[in-house]
């Protein structure tokens, strides 16, 4: 039998599967909408955590949950569809008790187990992280270069990219390397995408030469 707390979170999740306006209005809407099953669970959790002022705590706990579920000894029985649900719940209860997770995180895990959605856990964690990133005003930016950028170049690039942000927004920069682009860089910031790689320039030159042949 589901606990009252689990049932409450379950009701919030279900209301996102319907078009009933009144229950939807009672939820605290996240700053960004994430679609799909994972998005519905994450939105319900965001609403509950926001009302209790525990967004940061839940975010930290969810990252720990994702880490735990990557451990083979845990993932094998918990994510195996042929293992009885009661065994999964017992294993999860042991984990949540050991980690001393908050009731919000514990209830989410129990709800996912109850609904046979444990395989969606990583997706829920990712969706919640996306909401929290938007909550903090973070703008994700990925810079891909053929080789690691020098600190001076990276610092100058950050200054340029920050000039495109609105007030209150925070740049969250991730630098990656991909030798296949040959040189230059590829920048993705928010919804914008700029390809300044040597590889793309060569491809454009090749197409142009074929068209004029």
UniProtKB/Swiss-Prot annotation:
Keywords: Acetylation, ATP synthesis, Hydrogen ion transport, Ion transport, Membrane, Mitochondrion, Mitochondrion inner membrane, Transit peptide, Transport, Ubl conjugation. A motif (SIFI-degron) lies at residues 5-23. PROSITE patterns: ATPASE_DELTA (PS00389). GO terms for molecular function: proton-transporting ATP synthase activity, rotational mechanism. It is found in: Mitochondrion; Mitochondrion inner membrane. One of its GO terms (cellular component) is mitochondrial inner membrane. InterPro entries: ATP_synth_OSCP/delta_N_sf, ATPase_OSCP/d_CS, ATPase_OSCP/dsu. The modification N6-acetyllysine is found at residues 54, 60, 70, 73, 158, 162, 172, 176, 192. Acetylation at Lys-162 decreases ATP production. Deacetylated by SIRT3. Pfam families: OSCP. The modification N6-succinyllysine is found at residues 90, 158, 162, 199. It comes from the Eukaryota. Its main location: mitochondrion. Residues 1-23 form a transit peptide. Subunit OSCP, of the mitochondrial membrane ATP synthase complex (F(1)F(0) ATP synthase or Complex V) that produces ATP from ADP in the presence of a proton gradient across the membrane which is generated by electron transport complexes of the respiratory chain. ATP synthase complex consist of a soluble F(1) head domain - the catalytic core - and a membrane F(1) domain - the membrane proton channel. These two domains are linked by a central stalk rotating inside the F(1) region and a stationary peripheral stalk. NCBIfam families: ATP_synt_delta (TIGR01145). Belongs to the ATPase delta chain family. Component of the ATP synthase complex composed at least of ATP5F1A/subunit alpha, ATP5F1B/subunit beta, ATP5MC1/subunit c (homooctomer), MT-ATP6/subunit a, MT-ATP8/subunit 8, ATP5ME/subunit e, ATP5MF/subunit f, ATP5MG/subunit g, ATP5MK/subunit k, ATP5MJ/subunit j, ATP5F1C/subunit gamma, ATP5F1D/subunit delta, ATP5F1E/subunit epsilon, ATP5PF/subunit F6, ATP5PB/subunit b, ATP5PD/subunit d, ATP5PO/subunit OSCP. This is ATP synthase peripheral stalk subunit OSCP, mitochondrial. The lineage of its organism: Eukaryota, Metazoa, Chordata, Craniata, Vertebrata.
